[in-house]
Design a protein with these regions (language model features):
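Short N-terminal "domain-start" leader segments
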Residues: 1-46
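Mixed-charge, Lys/Arg-enriched low-complexity segments
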Residues: 2-6, 46-94
Length: 94
């Protein structure tokens, strides 16, 4: 799956170096959990960074960026919702 481009063209490898969630602090990303079936027939979940371009300067000035705990909590909540769907119930995810 192709990642969306960051707002200023910075490479994803640089943004996520050492910590997948570090982009939260710099770009005010929201996180989305994705369920997919891998080649071993197991369901796995991954996070996808989704840019939130609207209001970027205002948020920077006010210091109202997403925090790491909030991002992780959102990913977990979306993951739990997806795994509760009838089509995924009883599947193994990691």
């Amino acid at each position: 799956m192709e990642q969306p481009a960051p707002l200023d063209g910075t490479e994803w490898q640089e943004i996520t170096k050492g910590n997948w969630f570090c982009g939260v602090y710099r770009y005010r990303f929201d996180f989305e959990a994705i369920i997919q079936l891998n080649e071993n027939g197991r369901y796995e979940w991954a996070t996808r960074l989704v840019t939130e371009a609207s209001g970027e300067p205002d948020c920077e000035d006010s210091g109202d960026y997403a925090t790491l705990p909030r991002a992780e909590k959102k990913v977990r909540a979306i993951f739990d919702e997806l795994m509760a769907l009838p089509s995924l119930r009883g599947k193994t995810a990691y």
